[in-house]
């Protein structure tokens, strides 16, 4: 099974069917999710529930006589979690223009931080299990301030931003910008650089935001060593640091086993007084995300774009989840 070292929520490749300048691709996944945070007597949700997602992706493109390419993408997605059924909805569109190694996107952009290699797991869901298990494995997710960076939204409208991407040889550079309407406009600026040499990729990204607690800097080093994959990552999330170590190995020709461990530092007490959430251990009202999280994931390739996926994750707040199911792409 080929290890994917650049899997992000925006860029996971799938097979597609081409018709003129329109391509349709997608995937489905469904399975069981055990989550010990649920309790029918407390929140009305069973500990074991069905989790599922069906996604259709539409890519349209046209190219001028001079070689300038124009493209657009949108998705339709139906998702159910915690046994709550969900209907299908279209997301916001992304438009792009590219020429040789340059690309400009507008609308529902990818985002520089989101596009950084070495931050998501090398699994089909980019996380643990069949739906990611809340992505505690990502060093940018701390203190219940998860996904507070610009990223392509598969189920929503996105941020309506603009981004510039340049790739040449083993180098990729990415700058993104977005602004949010409101009584006070809120801007985000992201920058990312990645370089691949041989079997190794190094990457770094930074986001500067007008919103409180959203500034962050991330770095990663990843190696694809044949049968084995190794990676380390670190992030400073506006004063809360988090590091992670990751490894995966192919077992035979059809199986892959992955493990990870991350550790999150405590929030500064002055930030809590200023209104930030509290992740510290042994503090009343804390989300208790300080400390270590770990997980293990197993994948078995069934052929034809289908695989069995199973994983266990223990979060730093002592939440346990186990998931198993089927993932198939088309």
Positions of predicted regions on the chain:
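Outer-membrane beta-barrel proteins
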Residues: 2-330
